[in-house]
Amino acid sequence: MWGLLLAVTAFAPSVGLGLGAPSASVPGLAPGSTLAPHSSVAQPSTKANETSERHVRLRVIKKKKIVVKKRKKLRHPGPLGTARPVVPTHPAKTLTLPEKQEPGCPPLGLESLRVSDSQLEASSSQSFGLGAHRGRLNIQSGLEDGDLYDGAWCAEQQDTEPWLQVDAKNPVRFAGIVTQGRNSVWRYDWVTSFKVQFSNDSQTWWKSRNSTGMDIVFPANSDAETPVLNLLPEPQVARFIRLLPQTWFQGGAPCLRAEILACPVSDPNDLFPEAHTLGSSNSLDFRHHNYKAMRKLMKQVNEQCPNITRIYSIGKSHQGLKLYVMEMSDHPGEHELGEPEVRYVAGMHGNEALGRELLLLLMQFLCHEFLRGDPRVTRLLTETRIHLLPSMNPDGYETAYHRGSELVGWAEGRWTHQGIDLNHNFADLNTQLWYAEDDGLVPDTVPNHHLPLPTYYTLPNATVAPETWAVIKWMKRIPFVLSANLHGGELVVSYPFDMTRTPWAARELTPTPDDAVFRWLSTVYAGTNRAMQDTDRRPCHSQDFSLHGNVINGADWHTVPGSMNDFSYLHTNCFEVTVELSCDKFPHEKELPQEWENNKDALLTYLEQVRMGITGVVRDKDTELGIADAVIAVEGINHDVTTAWGGDYWRLLTPGDYVVTASAEGYHTVRQHCQVTFEEGPVPCNFLLTKTPKERLRELLATRGKLPPDLRRKLERLRGQK
């Protein structure tokens, strides 16, 4: 967000600020624009620009610079990407702007859904799926056009005066508009210029005009996806705002996705205005943190709570930024026997910023509440070792942060600096397991757990991001039991498998052997998340996950080969789900207090699930030392876990009666019944293993034949019996 504010401040002399703004021989009109019948601006003859590739947009902008230099009467267009309003019929006039601008107004809430469907109206719509309620910034369409979930508001073709209207419910100070075109894989629809109207009663309207009294035509989009911001030359106090498309892409339709920037104004009838502000008793830091600010905040938490925190790095990004982790425990830096390890990972996709801020808020909250003596937090930190990785992809985040919350779009910053999607970059162990299962090799020949990395994945020329390798080494170094991967752009919890078992299937229900546990974990988070439990909320984009409790099998949503969830399950002991936290990938700072309240209890409750099921220590019966890498198998579940280096283990299970087996190389297998109840805390299930005669003999031979006296006498008696 600060990237947006800095950009707007820097461009304050300009009326508008937009990335990928259109360029044409007539100011403000995109190449190939179609004029609305009532427009008084002549149609340009420039060939349509039908691509949104960045290098093409930059080339067009450079052309615009050349044109502007030739037109001496026009003001300099400003920095790259600056969108400027157009004054029809008076191209030589210069628009004089007031010195005071209001770039800091937050979004009204079309993208975050704070603006309800009932607050959006339009002059017409091509279909219900293209209605006014779909005119929200960054809204995504379904795979098929023409259904109930298309990717924009689109007016009817015969509508000669189309408009999209937003009701703010109360008077606000409108300061700017962000627009996009239609999200579709089949259509090319976007508005290239528009006018703006305001009203207090939806009956009497006035337009945004320049100092000479002429209507301002704002330049809009030159592609469907790049957000373009236009600031009003003079902020307007009103309740309603209308966007009136004037021109649109040639051969397309007037289609819009939008966000409105507006500042609240004082209401003389509101006696308690402070009651509408969501505060925090813990003085938490509700703002977006770039790399430097994140590091500073983590250091402050560590200094406030040095006895329960430790900061460490698991590696570096491609750009050299460290992947910092905050460890929180009563004995930081130490694995305590019998204490489970749990992690939260955020920022795998750099533009999905909410998870990063929630983890920074969580570490502040845990520190404050521990110092305050909160019993729930105290117990959590004394019985669990927590690891928080707020930014797995810091390079991508810095890109998104620089663009700002409203201009980052849907995908910019998602990938690493190398262009790698980290959630498709882990080794595909699913195919390896499923082929072995089809050949009847599991579990006798091929294990059903801790599958090794494929050879191709470790080759020097393998396309594996340094961020991915850092997390893999982290997974192998610490015996994690439970994890959640925090994403954004939806409101749902997805669980493994993420990859479909049928090759090339786009989606297919593909459960793990631990499907009951994963559904439990997912339901726990979804059931304690306030936004997911809001029965009145509308779907974010094209699927209504509330019909199924806001949880879904990942592969049944869309296949994701090489996901971190699947890799964690098949390569380590750790069970991991993906939490999609919000419809808005990069919510404005104004939204952070509410998002924290939506997720606070869910984050804590999910951490507490690490103590469900059974736990224990597998020891050598003679020495009583823990046995590392012993295999814990549960009858009826074709997925095993192993013990840590001290012999301790944790096996997540839902309530029920289980037959559990412990085995280790050189030891007799031991089996026992373990009953998991709904009582709080794990059920202890310890094992004592006895070495096999073969193992004893191997150890004796290792002592160069020097047998103990008792064993020597037994051997002599056996020889005498012969």
Curated annotation (Swiss-Prot):
<feature type="signal peptide">
    <location>
        <begin position="1"/>
        <end position="20"/>
    </location>
</feature>
<keyword id="KW-0378">Hydrolase</keyword>
<dbReference type="GO" id="GO:0005615">
    <property type="term" value="C:extracellular space"/>
</dbReference>
<dbReference type="InterPro" id="IPR008969">
    <property type="entry name" value="CarboxyPept-like_regulatory"/>
</dbReference>
<feature type="compositionally biased region" description="Polar residues">
    <location>
        <begin position="36"/>
        <end position="49"/>
    </location>
</feature>
<feature type="binding site">
    <location>
        <position position="349"/>
    </location>
    <ligand>
        <name>Zn(2+)</name>
    </ligand>
</feature>
<keyword id="KW-0479">Metal-binding</keyword>
<keyword id="KW-0645">Protease</keyword>
<dbReference type="Pfam" id="PF00246">
    <property type="entry name" value="Peptidase_M14"/>
</dbReference>
<feature type="glycosylation site" description="N-linked (GlcNAc...) asparagine">
    <location>
        <position position="49"/>
    </location>
</feature>
<keyword id="KW-0964">Secreted</keyword>
<keyword id="KW-1015">Disulfide bond</keyword>
<feature type="binding site">
    <location>
        <position position="352"/>
    </location>
    <ligand>
        <name>Zn(2+)</name>
    </ligand>
</feature>
<feature type="region of interest" description="Disordered">
    <location>
        <begin position="30"/>
        <end position="54"/>
    </location>
</feature>
<keyword id="KW-0862">Zinc</keyword>
<dbReference type="InterPro" id="IPR000834">
    <property type="entry name" value="Peptidase_M14"/>
</dbReference>
<feature type="glycosylation site" description="N-linked (GlcNAc...) asparagine">
    <location>
        <position position="307"/>
    </location>
</feature>
<feature type="glycosylation site" description="N-linked (GlcNAc...) asparagine">
    <location>
        <position position="210"/>
    </location>
</feature>
<feature type="domain" description="Peptidase M14">
    <location>
        <begin position="287"/>
        <end position="610"/>
    </location>
</feature>
<dbReference type="GO" id="GO:0008270">
    <property type="term" value="F:zinc ion binding"/>
</dbReference>
<feature type="disulfide bond">
    <location>
        <begin position="105"/>
        <end position="263"/>
    </location>
</feature>
<keyword id="KW-0482">Metalloprotease</keyword>
<comment type="similarity">
    <text>Belongs to the peptidase M14 family.</text>
</comment>
<dbReference type="Pfam" id="PF00754">
    <property type="entry name" value="F5_F8_type_C"/>
</dbReference>
<keyword id="KW-0325">Glycoprotein</keyword>
<dbReference type="InterPro" id="IPR000421">
    <property type="entry name" value="FA58C"/>
</dbReference>
<feature type="active site" description="Proton donor/acceptor">
    <location>
        <position position="580"/>
    </location>
</feature>
<dbReference type="InterPro" id="IPR008979">
    <property type="entry name" value="Galactose-bd-like_sf"/>
</dbReference>
<feature type="domain" description="F5/8 type C">
    <location>
        <begin position="103"/>
        <end position="263"/>
    </location>
</feature>
<comment type="function">
    <text>May be involved in cell-cell interactions. No carboxypeptidase activity was found yet.</text>
</comment>
<keyword id="KW-0732">Signal</keyword>
<dbReference type="GO" id="GO:0008237">
    <property type="term" value="F:metallopeptidase activity"/>
</dbReference>
<dbReference type="InterPro" id="IPR050753">
    <property type="entry name" value="Peptidase_M14_domain"/>
</dbReference>
<feature type="glycosylation site" description="N-linked (GlcNAc...) asparagine">
    <location>
        <position position="461"/>
    </location>
</feature>
<keyword id="KW-0121">Carboxypeptidase</keyword>
<dbReference type="Pfam" id="PF13620">
    <property type="entry name" value="CarboxypepD_reg"/>
</dbReference>
<feature type="binding site">
    <location>
        <position position="487"/>
    </location>
    <ligand>
        <name>Zn(2+)</name>
    </ligand>
</feature>
<protein>
    <recommendedName>
        <fullName>Probable carboxypeptidase X1</fullName>
        <ecNumber>3.4.17.-</ecNumber>
    </recommendedName>
</protein>
<feature type="glycosylation site" description="N-linked (GlcNAc...) asparagine">
    <location>
        <position position="200"/>
    </location>
</feature>
